Amino acid sequence: MATQPATESVQCFGRKKTAVAVTHCKRGSGLIKLNGCPIELFQPEILRFKIFEPILLLGKHRFAGVNMRIRVNGGGHTSQVYAIRQSIAKALVAYYQKYVDEQSKKEIKDILVRYDRTLLVADPRRCEPKKFGGRGARSRYQKSYR
């Protein structure tokens, strides 16, 4: 049995509320696929631009040498989009750290953090559960004294 050389790949995830996106990033020709479809076909268009933010910020030349396969599930449309963009950014940073060099990784990280910190750091806010004695998490039923 011949051993094949290990492919240069990293796997990163992004989270927003209950949405989780996992990105497999490996050496390639610049293809980015989302659930098996090209990322350019993602609908609606407004949310597609949100996904393209890390790509437009860093420039296509940084993505030219890598292929990305993204799987996303859970949450709503907007949460999924935020999870996707976070996983793309984190995967590229991890790939550059592991297989390129520390200097360009730091450059990428600085650009992303200066633009939007949530591209690399998850938002810890979650929905607060409902309690008894009211309609929601904090609101209470009206109280009558007479």
Curated annotation (Swiss-Prot):
PROSITE patterns: RIBOSOMAL_S9 (PS00360)
Entries under InterPro entries matching the protein: Ribosomal_Su5_D2-typ_SF, Ribosomal_uS9, Ribosomal_uS9_CS, Ribsml_uS5_D2-typ_fold_subgr
Gene Ontology MF terms: mRNA binding; structural constituent of ribosome
Pfam families xref list: Ribosomal_S9
One annotated Gene Ontology cellular component of this protein: plant-type cell wall
Biological process, per Gene Ontology: translation
Record's keyword terms, sorted: Ribonucleoprotein, Ribosomal protein
Keyword Membrane among record annotations: no
Family of the protein in this entry: Belongs to the universal ribosomal protein uS9 family.
Matching PANTHER family: RIBOSOMAL PROTEIN S16, RIBOSOMAL PROTEIN S9
Entry protein name: Small ribosomal subunit protein uS9z
Record lineage: Eukaryota, Viridiplantae, Streptophyta, Embryophyta, Tracheophyta
